[in-house]
């Protein structure tokens, strides 16, 4: 069995090596000719899976995407061909939620404006939006959720309108899929008019898709309003973001909010489980066996951490400033965006760091944030 796999997908060899011959390929430049003899195709969001790519293949048994979203996959075409498909919903939700939370802590420190006491509006209450809300609520932050689709589906959580978030939230974090048509389309959800209407001193965080915000309009509005603070992990026209926009963001990164080792492993592992199910064989590999030991054994806390100390704990796990600096230095280079994504192998989730502290009742929130070992 020939397994064609994006060369940047981690842990493929230990998971799929026993199932067939693994053929690594460049996902962004993948051609129909390369796919021709594949039995299994494993991709990431940089690969457009459609008739143009697959029409010359009559052997394909499974297509898997190690991503939350599926907007890069023609699901109708796969269904017409009776080709089984699976993605990895929620695989990197924890990573995205922690990224957004860490970014907010970093902004709070940079501008001496504590996160505690602010109101955060989350637009899109799916896996990543929910994970962001979980972090914020663990820390005691008031969260407003906007998701008209989930509200209409009967989701029991309390939702508010986007207008309410615009009026009441100090921070707005975007977590919607990209949809270009329909009543709730999200392309340019934040157009020039909506960007201009942001209340003074709003922090805007985008970890979903670049064209949820009109990037040209964002440049124009930001140049007029220095009070707006931006955290941008996603960009229109990836992998070539508008060079005028990057310097206007407080933190800028190349679509890596979900790129924790745990999240990457989880995505590949979910596809492994699905393929085993399809082949009717036992999935006998373990997710935990894939992850390396964290380089800090444990951190002992003398007292419950304040916000500054919490940021330091977060930086032990992931220092956003490092990726921001690297991105600014490399994004204009040829392939700089993709090279940084490919080589992004260092980030862990809060669960990798064990905390030791006797005063359990005072730090339950640290456990709820995701840190391990608290009070043990």
From Swiss-Prot:
Q: Name one GO molecular function term.
A: 4-phosphoerythronate dehydrogenase activity
At the top level of its lineage, which domain of life is listed? Bacteria
Where does the record say this protein resides? Cytoplasm
Indicate which residues the UniProt annotation says bind substrate: 45, 67, 259
User: PROSITE patterns, per this entry?
Assistant: D_2_HYDROXYACID_DH_3
Instruction: Indicate yes or no for the key word Oxidoreductase.
Output: yes
Which GO terms of type biological process are on file?
Answer: pyridoxine biosynthetic process
Cite the annotated pathway. Answer: Cofactor biosynthesis; pyridoxine 5'-phosphate biosynthesis; pyridoxine 5'-phosphate from D-erythrose 4-phosphate: step 2/5
PANTHER family, A to Z: D-ISOMER SPECIFIC 2-HYDROXYACID DEHYDROGENASE CATALYTIC DOMAIN-CONTAINING PROTEIN-RELATED, D-ISOMER SPECIFIC 2-HYDROXYACID DEHYDROGENASE FAMILY PROTEIN (AFU_ORTHOLOGUE AFUA_1G13630)
Free-text function comment from the UniProt entry: Catalyzes the oxidation of erythronate-4-phosphate to 3-hydroxy-2-oxo-4-phosphonooxybutanoate.
| UniProt name for this protein | Erythronate-4-phosphate dehydrogenase
